[in-house]
Amino acid sequence: RIEMITIYGKPRCPFCDRAKALCEQKGLEYEYKMLDADYTAEELFEKVPNAKTFPQIFIDDNPIGGYTDLEKLHG
């Protein structure tokens, strides 16, 4: 089964870029959402009330954390 990864990022975010690069290197299917273009901060806080850093990454709609959490799972 292919898991769906969603990366909620923002402009000028090195760890957002690293998360996308990791997905591409590993051949993982992902969707990238950009702050203000694709979602608002309020919408993100509804999904992850204690989000403090970017990116916020979800696998199959479940929040897993940030880049280092993705790297632990797929690095």
What are the language-model segments listed below?
Residues I2-L28:
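Local sequence-structure signature of Cys/Sec-based thiol-disulfide redox active-site neighborhoods
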Residues P14, Y39, G65:
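Short alpha-helical
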Residues Y30-Y32, P63:
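Conserved beta-strand scaffold positions in the cores of enzyme catalytic domains, especially
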Residues M34-A51:
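Thioredoxin-like thiol-disulfide oxidoreductase module
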Residues V48-F58, Y67-T68:
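Structural micro-motif
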Residues I59-G75:
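Non-catalytic, surface beta->alpha helical segment in thiol-disulfide oxidoreductase systems
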